[in-house]
């Protein structure tokens, strides 16, 4: 019954967030702060991962395409679609679940254990709206931007690896990028990014907000939040792919 009670408390938490703010200016400052923490705080790791994802994709694709009947520009097509459809949204969001998700869970957990949340509630502040909603809205704004950046850097990293290792020329790689391009793939990746960003922010917020105990329980809640977020991301990835990709229907 624990899982059903957790789902119920999670839904009640989401419902409790949507109330009229007591001080809109205070909420705006918290929203900007969360945008800085989630967006710019994760920019470095996202950039590094994206470049190497594209580079590894290019090298491994070239290793497998050994048939002389397949034009070299196909490498660019495969890297483009792989990065846009799967690597950029899914892998980057799994990393962000560990980076941003653990921070959200530990921050709220520390506030709960130190009774800061109780103090805010005594002051008449809706802590769900003030502490959780800005994190979710900031994630919905910043994480899709990070995913879009990851797409561009992943494709650029693949081009860099292709030219540096002599697999194929830059013009051949660019030709492959333009061949059989499906714009819906980008839209699909951004849809996944929005769904994943809600999971990354709301699930750790739930585990951090309702933590009980001391420092040990905060660590356990952060770990559980990251694990559950990653599982939900992979499950949502499959569901969205089965529902939205034309070939899967």
Q: What kind of region is each of these model predictions?
A:
Residues 45, 72-104, 138-147, 180-196:
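Loop-to-helix entry region at the N-terminal start of transmembrane alpha-helices
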Residues 45-62, 239:
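Hydrophobic alpha-helical transmembrane segments of multi-pass membrane transport/permease proteins
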Residues 1-29, 207, 212:
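Short, membrane-interfacial amphipathic segments enriched in basic
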Residues 49-52, 92-97, 133-162, 203, ...:
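Hydrophobic alpha-helical transmembrane segments that constitute the membrane-spanning cores
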Residues 22-48, 227-230:
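Membrane-interface helix starts
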Residues 115, 127-147, 221, 225:
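Start (N-cap) of specific transmembrane helices in multi-pass transporter permeases
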Residues 60-84, 152-194, 202-222, 244-249:
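Membrane-interfacial helix-loop-helix connectors in multipass membrane proteins
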Residues 108-133, 215-218:
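Short cytoplasmic-facing helical segments at TM-TM junctions of multi-pass membrane proteins
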């Amino acid at each position: 019954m624990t899982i059903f009670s957790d789902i119920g408390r999670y839904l009640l938490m989401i419902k409790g967030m949507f109330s009229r703010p007591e001080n809109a200016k205070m909420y705006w400052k918290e929203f900007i702060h969360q945008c800085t923490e989630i967006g710019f705080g994760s920019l470095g790791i996202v950039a590094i991962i994206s470049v190497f994802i594209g580079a590894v994709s290019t090298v491994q694709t070239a290793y497998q395409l050994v048939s002389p009947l397949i034009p070299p520009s196909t490498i660019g097509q495969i890297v483009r679609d792989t990065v846009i459809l799967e690597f950029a949204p899914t892998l980057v969001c799994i990393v962000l679940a560990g980076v941003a998700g653990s921070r959200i869970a530990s921050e709220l957990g520390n506030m709960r254990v130190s009774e800061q949340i109780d103090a805010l509630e005594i002051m008449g502040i809706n802590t769900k709206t003030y502490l959780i909603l800005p994190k979710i809205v900031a994630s919905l704004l910043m994480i899709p931007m990070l995913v879009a950046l990851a797409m561009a850097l992943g494709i650029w990293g693949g081009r860099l690896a292709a030219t540096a290792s002599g697999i194929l020329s830059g013009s051949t790689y660019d030709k492959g990028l333009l061949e059989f391009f499906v714009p819906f793939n980008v839209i699909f990746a951004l849809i996944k990014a929005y769904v994943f960003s809600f999971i990354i922010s709301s699930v750790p917020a739930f585990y951090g907000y309702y933590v009980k105990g001391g420092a040990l329980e905060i660590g356990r809640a952060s770990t559980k939040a990251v694990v559950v977020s990653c599982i939900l991301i992979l499950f949502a990835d499959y569901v969205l792919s089965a529902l939205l990709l034309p070939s899967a229907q």
